[in-house]
């Protein structure tokens, strides 16, 4: 699941999913890396204005702009009930799909998340689907306007040291610096 909605205030309101780096949208970096790992079931939580390739499922919280936790709940509602694991990514971390092998190796309890620059990157994680669902939609009702950190606080998460692959791009300056490293 890729979160690709939001207002992107620190990007000047530009859709993060559509920000180009070297001729490719941030979202497309993730989709291409998932395809390279034979991940074929992908849900993107994004408004209709974000173009998705054929075969990629779209979801969006209702009403929109309820925050990332509401987006996660909306994305989970689209998943097949038998899905044991959910890879959760944010479109502003364009290389994060490359963390999947390390996250899978680190998964012990409820999930494994990237640890980068002194922080747990909760939107770069591999989660046990039912545990994630219980955290973001207790009682089947998706939470809104709550931080991801607070919603996932009760989960037993393993941290996985990850290099710059988990870098998230919050400003146009971040995008420029990241592009220079590619």
Task: Walk through the language-model features, giving the residues of each.
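Nucleotide and nucleotide-moiety/phosphate-recognizing core
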Residues: 1-145, 153-165, 172-175
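SAM-dependent methyltransferases
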Residues: 176-182
């Amino acid at each position: 699941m890729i979160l690709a909605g939001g207002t992107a205030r620190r990007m000047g309101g530009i859709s993060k999913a559509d920000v180009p780096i070297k001729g490719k949208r941030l979202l497309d970096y993730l989709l291409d890396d998932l395809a390279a790992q034979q991940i074929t079931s992908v849900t993107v939580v994004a408004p209709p204005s974000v173009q998705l390739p054929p075969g990629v499922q779209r979801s969006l919280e209702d009403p929109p702009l309820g925050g990332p936790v509401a987006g996660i709940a909306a994305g989970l509602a689209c998943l097949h009930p038998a899905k044991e694991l959910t890879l959760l990514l944010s479109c502003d971390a364009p290389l994060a799909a490359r963390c999947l092998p390390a996250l899978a190796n680190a998964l012990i309890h409820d999930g494994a998340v990237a640890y980068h620059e002194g922080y747990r990157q909760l939107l770069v994680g591999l989660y046990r689907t039912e545990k994630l669902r219980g955290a973001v939609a207790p009682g089947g009702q998706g939470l809104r306007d709550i931080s991801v950190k607070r919603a996932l606080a009760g989960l037993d998460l393993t941290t996985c040291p990850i290099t710059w692959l988990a870098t998230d791009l919050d400003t146009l300056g971040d995008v420029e610096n990241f592009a220079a490293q590619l």
